[in-house]
Amino acid sequence: KKDNLVLMYQTHSNKVVELKKQNLKKKIKADAMVTRIKNLALGVVTADCVPILIYDKKNQIVGCIHSGWKGAFADIIKNTILKIKKLNSNSEIYASIGPCIGKNSYEVDLKFQKKFIKKSKKNIRYFSKKNKNKSLFNLRKFVHDKLSEFRVNIDHVKHDTFKEKDNFFSFRRS
């Protein structure tokens, strides 16, 4: 039913909202939602960013994350997992990473790359040099590794939204 679908007004932030009966009808401004409410579908809309669906079977908690580079950089994944754990979830958490821009399609300038490396020198592993002014960024791997830090079980739907124009919308291609 349409009444059971909840979408967010996505803001490229690190804000996570826990959905409860009291805030279900309100406009949700965030980039992640989690809930224990049964028969509720959570939705995320992307156009190259990474959609992530999360599930804790034991505690019956579901969540979704809109993770573009800004949100991933600002710890949207960490904030979401911590919010789920705050709901008494110390069991196995499962995540599915959906279609997003691929590592060979995400061209960035060196300023972008330096921003990530300044945060952590280890972030160099998510970049490969394209030419003297540009690099390619592996957003999917960056997001995967952020989930792995919390020992989340991860599945991938490996499609490149930029390259697969017949199947997906791409912000960068438009």
Please describe what each predicted stretch is.
Residues 1-174:
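Active-site microenvironment for binding and transforming phosphate-containing groups
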